[in-house]
Each structure stands twice: as structure tokens, then as C-alpha cells.
A protein has these predicted regions:
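Surface-exposed loop and turn segments in beta-propeller and other repeat-based domains
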Residues: 11-39, 78-91, 129-166, 222-230, ...
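Structural signature of eukaryotic scaffold interfaces centered on beta-propeller domains
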Residues: 37-52, 94-102, 159-195, 236-240, ...
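Short N-terminal edge-element motif at the start of the domain
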Residues: 44, 51-96
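Residue-level signature of beta-propeller blades and closely related beta-rich strand-turn architectures
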Residues: 61-62, 105, 112, 121, ...
Length: 336
């Protein structure tokens, strides 16, 4: 049985001072990759999720190199790259814009193709060299990770395939305030299945839908359910109590934004914002919750870093993201 704790971590992370003009107004802590990964234009970080004591970050290659996962220990400030493979052992060529960890299962977004499921037991250690690689760049890769299965759930009643641009796993029994309004009877809070949240990146008239899918033991349970439309340029989604929190990017030189929708738990006071209290976001003061289909209004501008991507929460409920642009890349913990 493999474990992420068994993966050797030969590369070094570095703590960064928080620079809010780069890292966003909600930034609390920041870490940087090593110099090569900070500046490479071949590999671009995208998805993020916590897997117990390890942080996982996905990258895709702009030079047909496939995709990879960085296994990160932020306490020791070290990490390793683990190339992703198809079930046949070929490089997994996906954008990997979102990740979600589900008790040994890893879900990897594959845009129009759906999403892949991987399991930690399938990690294959490579004695320091990645399979099918002879380049110096990947000689320190200690393992490869083959995918098990591709899933492509569709939205009932929609002719347009859902694009799995990003994702995150919600807590057991989570539902949005709008879903609760539509339900009658007693709420169930069973620990399984888990809600998988997902959304579409879109600009220029492309759809920007948000959806949820129940997952159990790495398998979809039931249909994909629509949660409404989000703003253009979405890069990540996670929960905020009974609400949804999404990130949007603004190019390689401007900070991104966060958008909130949901119930009364989204209301904050001026004091919370002024003091920068943990669990708050800049510019949220006085804003009431909104249903998911009104997410496009009321952004909390410049709260997210330049090149903001996927969102996730750790076991303590803290908010995390990653920035993608060379020279400004960082793993970030945000207020929220």
C-alpha cells in the first residue's frame, strides 16, 4: 500500500514575505517553488488540494509533456514532482485545472473530457527517474502516478457538455442555502457520498456553469446537478459555510478576485474586515448572501493573487490557492 508520506521530496520550497500588490488583499502566508519551477514556461501550476499532511498541486505542460502533481510538505518546505500517466502508461495530457482529494482518491479535472480518478495505492516509485524521461529536468522525480478511469458526467437536459475546468470536494452533507430552500423534509448528514464541486472557465460568451456531483469510493453517484452560472474567468470553487466561493483571474499583471454566493453566513461586519480577522475576506463588509445564479455580481476585487487558480480548504477550513505566472508563482493561504 503506497502513501504520499513515502514520496521522497528532493526540491526546496521557500517562504515568501506577503506582498499584497502581488499576492492579493486576502493573502496571509506565501511560499515559492525553487528557481527553475518559479521561472519555467513549460510547466504551469493549476489545481490544488490537501491530502492529509501533504499539499498537492497540479501542473500542465505547454510542450506536450503531459501533467504532473507536486507533493508538498510545507512544514519541511520541500516537494517532489510526480508525473501523471494514463492507464496504459503514457503521459496524461490534460490541463489539470482542478484537483480534489477524497480519502485516497485523487480527482483531476480534464476540461471537456471530464475528470480522471487516481488512487494513492497506484503510486509507482521510480528510483529517482520518471518513466519515459531522460531529461535533467525530471531526473529527481521519485514516482509516477497512473490514472484509473475517466468520467464524463453530463448535466441532464443540457446539450452542451460540461467542461471540468476546476473542482473541490465539499464537506460531507454540505448543501448550498439555495438547495436547502428547494428541499422539504429533514436534512440528511450522512458521511458518504461526498459532494464534488466543479465549474467551467469561460470568457467571450462561453458558458460558466457551476455544478455538483456526489462521489463515493472514487465513483460518481447519481446525476450531475447544476448550481447556477458564475462570473467570466472563473478558476476555482470551494465552500464558504453554506455558500460558494469562486476565484477569477485578471491576466499576468493584475490581481484576481473572489466572489461569494449563498446564505446568511456570508454576512460580515466592518470590524471583521478592518481587523483582517481569520476567516474573513477583504471588501465583504455589509454584503448579504446571494443565490448561486447571481454569482457574477459583487466581486471582492484584488483579494486574490496575480494568476489565481484553483481553490481548496484544509482540514481546519483554511483557504488555499496557487498562482500560475512565471516570476509571481506562489502557494498561498488566504483569509476566507
Amino acid at each position: 500500500m503506497s502513501s504520499l508520506l513515502d514520496v521522497p521530496l528532493p526540491r526546496r520550497m521557500h517562504r515568501l514575505p506577503v506582498v499584497r500588490l502581488v499576492h492579493g488583499r486576502a493573502a496571509e502566508r506565501a511560499w515559492s517553488w525553487d528557481l527553475r519551477d518559479q521561472w519555467t514556461r513549460e510547466w504551469w501550476p493549476q489545481g490544488i488540494t490537501w491530502a492529509g499532511e501533504r499539499l498537492l498541486v497540479s501542473w500542465y505542460s505547454r510542450r506536450d509533456g503531459g501533467s504532473r502533481i507536486s507533493v508538498v510538505d510545507l512544514v519541511a518546505r520541500c516537494y517532489a514532482h510526480v508525473p501523471l500517466l494514463t492507464p496504459d502508461g503514457e503521459p496524461l495530457r490534460v490541463h489539470a485545472g482542478g484537483l480534489a482529494w477524497d480519502d485516497g482518491w485523487l480527482y483531476v479535472a480534464a476540461t471537456a473530457r471530464g475528470f480522471w480518478t487516481l488512487h494513492v495505492d497506484d503510486l509507482a516509485f521510480t528510483a529517482g527517474r520518471a518513466a519515459r524521461s531522460t531529461s535533467d529536468e525530471r531526473r529527481r522525480d521519485p514516482a509516477t502516478w497512473p490514472a484509473r478511469r475517466l468520467h464524463r458526467p453530463t448535466l441532464p437536459g443540457s446539450d452542451d457538455p460540461f467542461r471540468w475546468s476546476f473542482m473541490d470536494l465539499a464537506p460531507p452533507g454540505w448543501s448550498s442555502s439555495e438547495e436547502r430552500k428547494r428541499r422539504s423534509g429533514v436534512e440528511t448528514t450522512t458521511a458518504s457520498p461526498r459532494p464534488l464541486l466543479a465549474g467551467e472557465y469561460g470568457r467571450g460568451g462561453k458558458s460558466t456553469r457551476l455544478a455538483r456531483l456526489e462521489m463515493s469510493n472514487g465513483q460518481p453517484v447519481g446525476d450531475l446537478h447544476a448550481l447556477g452560472e458564475g462570473p467570466a474567468g472563473m478558476q476555482g470553487v470551494t465552500t464558504y459555510a453554506d455558500a460558494l466561493l469562486v476565484s477569477t483571474s485578471a491576466g499576468p499583471w493584475r490581481r484576481g478576485s473572489l466572489h461569494l454566493a449563498g446564505g446568511p453566513s456570508t454576512e460580515l461586519s466592518e470590524t471583521d474586515v478592518d481587523q483582517g480577522a481569520p476567516g474573513t475576506l477583504p471588501e465583504l463588509a455589509g454584503r448579504a448572501g446571494r443565490p448561486a445564479d447571481e454569482l457574477a455580481s459583487g466581486p471582492f476585487r484584488r483579494a486574490a493573487p496575480i494568476g489565481v487558480e484553483d481553490l481548496t480548504r484544509d482540514d481546519l477550513g483554511r483557504l488555499w490557492t496557487v498562482g500560475e505566472h512565471p516570476g509571481r508563482r506562489a502557494v498561498l493561504r488566504l483569509h476566507g
